[in-house]
């Protein structure tokens, strides 16, 4: 069991015990985070970034760690998220292996890694932990909450469970619930890991490690993170040179196969398999429609001034999750301004889900807009297609 923590990581100790949504508690748990920029005297210029499944908190280079981060082109002085103006915080998700407490962390009660004794993890737990970091920094209200991919789910849960925590929100390639296709893919990824004999019920080590299972899980993920349009343009049917091809008659032959293999091998030893299982399942469980029947965070679940924006079928229906009940869940969120952005080629979090987020937040009274970008790079476009995503983020933040 290994944790992979970047240099310069900061830590916030969560309240102990820290209750989990689906039962159980954590003791002496922590959240890893990093910061950029300077917090204004009135603490009004703070932005929080919540991430996808695998990133650490090192979104960009800073004084504590000059190494480029995973969102380097988006975050820094003069960049779309301009740290000359904004004080930016990025948190590593609870349940991860990148500094925050997760299955790879030591359980203080036993002195051994949690492994599968870690409590069931939900997106709501990740959101609550992030909110506690904001409070600990003395920030009463964020200028903007930014969430991408899984972080888009986390951001919505955070806004719903902690009313007033942000004035505005940017949801990038996120969703208000997991769709069947996405659940199916992640189920196969988890199965690949669990069927590897070296997984051993979660009891593996560096010598006996579920490398084959992790490699297959990562390949499945990468296929859904990009798009067929990109595969066609980038690889076509080009074959490997004879010296690159595998001796196995059914081994690597095409460039696209080699790309997947290389990508997977770079990942498998830098993310803990049990953490992968927990975070993956938390995404499948997330459904904002489940919050419709909860006690409202404000005086009414749906602001009467905007109730007409929702169809009649959006009234709470216990145990039933439909597009309308998702909209009703979104409409319970109180936010002044919001932007939902997605790539039209995204098959994992289809662009219709970002449009749904904008529609639901608008029904709750937000000045909410949706932008579907014609990027060929699928779900991962927000990590690489800065020419398209950068201007949208910059323009929105200029008015915050």
Curated annotation (Swiss-Prot):
The reply on keyword Amino-acid biosynthesis is yes
The record places the active site at 149 (nucleophile), 346, 379
Q: Which GO terms describe its cellular component?
A: cytoplasm
Compartment list: Cytoplasm
> Hey, where's the site called Important for acyl-CoA specificity on this chain?
186
Q: Which SUPFAM superfamilies does the protein's record reference?
A: alpha/beta-Hydrolases (SSF53474)
Q: Where does substrate bind?
A: 218, 380
The yes or no answer to whether the keyword Amino-acid biosynthesis is present is: yes
Give its E.C. classification number: 2.3.1.-
Region of interest (Important for substrate specificity), residue spans: 52-55
Give the main location: cytoplasm
The protein's annotated pathway: Amino-acid biosynthesis; L-cysteine biosynthesis; L-cysteine from L-serine: step 1/2
The reaction(s) annotated as catalysed by this protein in its Swiss-Prot or TrEMBL entry are:
succinyl-CoA + L-serine = O-succinyl-L-serine + CoA
Question: What function is annotated for this protein?
Answer: Transfers a succinyl group from succinyl-CoA to L-serine, forming succinyl-L-serine.
Q: How does it assemble?
A: Homodimer.
* UniProt record similarity statement: Belongs to the AB hydrolase superfamily. MetX family.
Any idea what this protein is called?
Serine O-succinyltransferase
Organism of origin is Xanthomonas euvesicatoria pv. vesicatoria (strain 85-10)
């Amino acid at each position: 069991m290994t944790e992979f923590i970047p240099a310069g990581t900061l830590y916030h100790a969560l309240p102990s015990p820290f209750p989990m949504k689906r039962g159980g508690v954590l003791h002496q748990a922590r959240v890893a985070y990093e910061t950029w920029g300077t917090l204004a005297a009135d603490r009004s210029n703070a932005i929080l970034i919540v991430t996808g499944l695998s990133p650490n908190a090192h979104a960009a280079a800073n004084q504590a760690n000059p190494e480029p981060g995973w969102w380097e082109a988006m975050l820094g002085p003069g960049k779309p998220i301009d740290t000359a103006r904004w004080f930016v915080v990025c948190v590593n998700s609870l349940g991860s292996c990148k500094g925050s407490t997760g299955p790879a962390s030591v359980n203080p009660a036993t002195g051994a890694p949690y492994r599968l004794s870690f409590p069931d993890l939900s997106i709501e737990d990740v959101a609550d932990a992030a909110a506690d970091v904001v409070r600990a920094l003395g920030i009463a209200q964020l200028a903007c909450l930014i969430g991408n991919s899984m972080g888009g789910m986390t951001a919505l849960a955070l806004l719903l469970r902690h009313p007033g925590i942000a004035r505005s929100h940017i949801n990038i390639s996120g969703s208000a619930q997991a769709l069947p296709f996405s659940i199916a893919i992640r189920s196969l990824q988890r199965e690949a890991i669990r069927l590897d004999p070296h997984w051993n019920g979660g009891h593996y080590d560096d010598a006996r490690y579920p490398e084959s299972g992790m490699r297959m899980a990562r390949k499945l993920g990468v296929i859904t993170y990009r798009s067929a349009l990109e595969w066609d343009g980038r690889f076509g049917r080009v074959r490997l040179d004879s010296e690159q091809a595998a001796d196995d008659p059914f081994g690597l032959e095409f460039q696209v196969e080699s790309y997947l293999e290389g990508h997977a091998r770079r990942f498998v030893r830098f993310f803990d398999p049990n953490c992968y299982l927990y975070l993956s399942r938390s995404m499948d469980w997330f459904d904002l429609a489940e919050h419709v029947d909860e006690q409202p965070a404000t005086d009414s679940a749906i602001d009467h001034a905007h109730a007409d924006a929702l169809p009649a079928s959006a009234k709470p229906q216990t145990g039933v999750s439909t597009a309308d009940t998702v909209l009703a869940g979104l409409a319970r969120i109180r936010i002044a301004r919001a932007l939902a952005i997605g790539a039209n080629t995204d098959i994992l979090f289809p662009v219709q889900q970002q449009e749904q987020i904008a529609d639901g937040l608008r029904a709750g009274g937000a000045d909410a807009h949706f932008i579907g970008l014609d990027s060929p790079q699928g779900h991962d476009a927000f990590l690489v297609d800065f020419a398209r995503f950068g201007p949208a983020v910059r323009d929105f933040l200029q008015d915050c």
